[in-house]
Amino acid sequence: MTPFTPSPLSRRQWLKSSGLVAGGAMATGSLTPSLLPALESDAVHVIDGQTTAAGFAAHEQMVAAARRADGPIRLASNENPYGMAPSARKAIEDGWKQHAWYGAPSLPNLKKVYADSVGVPVDHIMIVAGSSELLSIVCLAYGMKGDVLTAWPTYEGLPRYAESLGIRVHKVPLAADLTHDLDTMDRRLTQAVDLTFVCNPNNPTANVTDNAKLRSFVSNASRRSMVLVDEAYHDFVTDPSYSSLVDMVKKGENVIISRTGSKIHGLAGLRTAFVIARPDIIARLQPLSTSAPGVFGALGAAASLQDTAFQAMCKQRNVEGREIMKTAIAKMGRKMTDSQTNFVFFHAGMPVEQVQKAMLAKGFMIGRAFPPYTDWARISIGTPDEMRAVAAALPEIIGGAPKSLGSSER
């Protein structure tokens, strides 16, 4: 197998060499549907809304070439390296004329498709323009009269927004195994706390918190505050002991589940996210929402949700890339978490900024520092070939770095 190496080839050069520029037309910005290769025909690659194995293979080759052409490989923001499903692209192309219309006529269908996919009534679903808005409106609805409780470090969107509003945020350090310290969080759950935030699997640590303990904590917390559970990485989990907390919503508890179209569905640029909650909670959140996904986000998300074959193939490729990284990190004798996401988190033994700089020189962008774990690295999972190249580069960069952990990182 030919080793993977990031290419200095520019996007413009790649478009020319790939024969994607015709009649003097030249692409600018990101690849648009009209410039993507036909991949033979939709009849071959998407059958009954499902991406075929042959279609995924062709799609994978095309996307890998485009990623190399774009410059440094993006392994910093936990994006899906395969982008949107061919079925989603087809849905957007078929609905292209809707781009001139206000609103998104396809939103009601998306709501129904999503409700069916998670097994709740339609009135338990709200669609918003990305997770950032979702977290903001939950904070406005349930965090303004008291404090916010969260583990730390975790996904920063909600805590950061709360602090910008002058809300007091109680940040509970992670446990020794870098999971949520639920015992301490429970002790900090005073009458002053109005909103409790849990990210599971957690970002940046990539791991899941014990299912039984988390359920017990959330059930208790929901009797004292609203609980927001961010399940952005739910679709990547392979740990059989893990389960979503959607069933707690079905039981009528004070729990809001946050999901996104940005990860396994590859729709980060189309800003689509999902709220799962009781109807009365949805009714309180809805007036605070200032926007909704555009027509293309709604069309693409609905098609992708139904394309379970594409999701399964993305998940399998993610497992392959994740195992490549876990093996490489273990061989270097580095401490790491048990990743259940599309990224890994491990002890590099040197400031992350140095690792970033060295990896960028080799053609890879990786994640930033997450205090207090400033010598731990977060690297998103790309294609298996990309991860083999990363695994080969890491020993040269961090091989001689200290393996012992600082007192704040034990």
PLM feature spans:
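PLP-dependent aminotransferase class I/II
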Residues: 254-337
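Conserved PLP-anchoring active-site segment centered on the Schiff-base-forming lysine
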Residues: 141-161
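C-terminal segment of N-terminal export signals and the immediately downstream linker at the start
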Residues: 31-77, 83-94, 405-410
